[in-house]
Amino acid sequence: MQSQDPKTTLFAPGVDAEEALALPHNRPQAVEQPMHRREPKQVRATVLFGDIVGSTERLAAMGDHKWMKVLDAYYAIIHKGFGTFQGIHLSTAGDGFLATFDHPVQAIQCAAAILESVKELGLRIRFGMHVGECLSVDEFVGGLTVHIGARIAAAADAGEVLVSDAVKSHLVDSAIRFVDRGNHDLKGVPGRWRLFTAC
């Protein structure tokens, strides 16, 4: 079982890191925010969550300063991936992130590129992905689709891009292969969810 990451203790009781990534106050923002937002609009998006597996152990072994240098290199890699595959980086919590894409194939290609690039840093990353209707306002995206994506990421293993059946259904004609990972219970989400490893 994974030891608890520092990021899971940064939020209010009952709110874990995956949920926190979906909260608007965890995205980069100016010190002063307007007291109102524009009306949200419904959009269809692919949400991609990723985080470092075993980051607490790495931090403890390396020390704060060396670990921060690794994180700087890590975030440079993921931002390059977002730029290459047209992803939008929405929020960050600890070493985890949330991004959206117009199409699942872009998100899978981005995740694969990040996995390959972080090998030089000795990092193990896991990804979770879902596609569906979201509510978008300003630079914030929310809704059940986002939370499902977060829960899928929590079920992923190191080095895995774990996706929902909805993602797989969008890619029936693509060259991307999928390995059936069976049905899963996703915390707080009704029903059983069929998940697949994209490879």
Task: For each feature predicted by the language model, list its residue ranges.
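Intrinsically disordered or compositionally simple regulatory linkers and C-terminal tails
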Residues: 2-42, 199
